[in-house]
Amino acid sequence: MNNEQNMTQNIDQTTQTAAEQATAAQTAAEQKLAKKKLTRRIFIGGSLGALAVVGGGAGWAYNRYLAEHTEIEDTTAYEAAAQQANASASGSTTADPTELTGVKVNGQSLTANEGSITITSTTTGSGSDAVVSFVADIKLDNATLLRSAFANNKFGQNIIDTPSNIASEHNGIWAINGDYYGFRTTGIVIRNGVVYRDSGAREGLAFYRDGSVKLYDETATNAQTLVNEGVWNTLSFGPALVKDSAVVDGIDSVEVDTNFGNHSIQGNQPRTGVGVLGTNHLVFIVV
């Protein structure tokens, strides 16, 4: 994916939050902005959603798909220690910026000294056929202002929460759900420049410290190499819809997640996408 002026979109194939939850989370965020009860951070969520279990083997299914399995109890402390170690290894003495300053709100738009956020919404159809989409156009001076946070500040499997709660707990001014890492045991998971999982399995999306964003093959690299190359966050999801300003060949025949624990989400289901318009210029959509 070209990071200059080329749109690349990835769609979260495992978003399980209901449409009304996504709408409610976005509405709550807008209300907070309108009241100017502002916090200062922008977040991509960790593990979000509701799981459905069907069929027999209830004990096994509960343990695999519902029971929490915590690998890291305090991700904030874990990241602080890892970032300090990385800084010592690289000899860097410059801290990454983490907060917006000089925040001003006008309707659904926000401006700050370090960038801007503009939110728009569109409704098509009516009644039970109504589809609501929210689009956030985000411009930042520094890519590290876009941070990740985990549900309950833990890393593991089946640890869930809503985007609004995660944002509130981490002083987020805007938030969106992430790649649903917690349902899987595979994928490369890098958050805020720190490695959490290194088990390449699929196509991923890498957000770099320099503001560029690239699609990549997880099986052709490893997490530490990506961090050394300047990756700040990764999303292990897909499929890619647009690459180098063109629709990806065969996208209309790609089957989206159909496994036992995570029921099929083919057809009309809540979706989350991200697009890249240029360096440090991103667009996020929730439908």
Language model features: what each stretch is:
Residues 138-143, 210, 244-246, 279:
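Generic structural motif
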Residues 2-3, 25-35, 40-204, 212-215:
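Zymogen propeptides
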Residues 173-177, 206, 275, 283-285:
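Structural recognition of the beta-strand scaffold that forms the well-ordered cores
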Residues 181-259, 263-265:
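Active-site-adjacent helix-turn-beta-strand microarchitecture at beta-sheet edges
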Residues 1-28:
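N-terminal targeting leaders characterized by basic, low-complexity, disordered sequences
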Residues 252-287:
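Domain-core and long-helix interface of multi-subunit machines
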Residues 170-171, 201-202, 210, 236-237, ...:
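Short coil/turn connectors at secondary-structure junctions
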